Amino acid sequence: MQIKSAEFIKSAAKPVGYPPGDLPEVAFAGRSNVGKSSLINVLVNRRGLVRTSSTPGRTQLLNFFEVNQHFMLVDLPGFGFAKVPVSVKKAWGRMTRTYLEERTNLKAVVLLFDIRREPRDEELQLLDWLEELNIPTIPVITKVDKVTKNRRRAQIRPILEATGLPQEAFSFFSALTREGREDILQRLDVALSDVEDEFGIDVPESE
């Protein structure tokens, strides 16, 4: 897949604020500070398109980005940040739940896992929930540059055991080295492969 353009469209908390559902969407989900914003920036080759922060819990709305004028990437609020008030956590949960259950043009969810952290209940529940909703999931292990290659296998083992997924189901990503970018773009290509007929658009292929 070639990324020719990317722009921020809007933020929204409720369906009434979503952009029109006339383009297919891929959402990005994961715990706070897992690297969703950095991943999107690298995928679209636009440093700073999605604001990144070292402060967990910064993304508090659904953020919509239009790519190639043909599809949307949606940055969902992160979850699991202990210092966020309970009321805010519940609001984020409602936002995400409503979006995933009601957004009919959602084609896939990229679910991120930090290589340095064992999956928590929220991540595993979301993985199960996506399966129940029949939403294709692209699991990605992020921040792989934070551990040595010799330690990588040991670090990913708890993630494989907790999720029950084989290693080949995951993409491995580093915002620093850009490792995994092409692999993830290829998987997005597959997730969007039926949009030409459904939405009447043409997604540019890789050269």
UniProtKB/Swiss-Prot annotation:
GO terms for cellular component: cytosol. One of its GO terms (molecular function) is metal ion binding. Its cofactor is Mg(2+). It holds the Pfam family MMR_HSR1. Mg(2+) binds at S37, T59. Keywords: Cell cycle, Cell division, GTP-binding, Magnesium, Metal-binding, Nucleotide-binding, Septation. Residues 22-194 form the EngB-type G domain. GO terms for biological process: division septum assembly. It comes from the Bacteria. InterPro entries: G_ENGB_dom, GTP-bd, GTP-bd_ribosome_bio_YsxC, P-loop_NTPase. GTP binds at residues 30-37, 57-61, 75-78, 142-145, 173-175. SUPFAM superfamilies: P-loop containing nucleoside triphosphate hydrolases. The keyword Magnesium applies. Belongs to the TRAFAC class TrmE-Era-EngA-EngB-Septin-like GTPase superfamily. EngB GTPase family. Necessary for normal cell division and for the maintenance of normal septation. This is Probable GTP-binding protein EngB. The lineage of its organism: Bacteria, Pseudomonadati, Thermodesulfobacteriota, Desulfuromonadia, Desulfuromonadales.
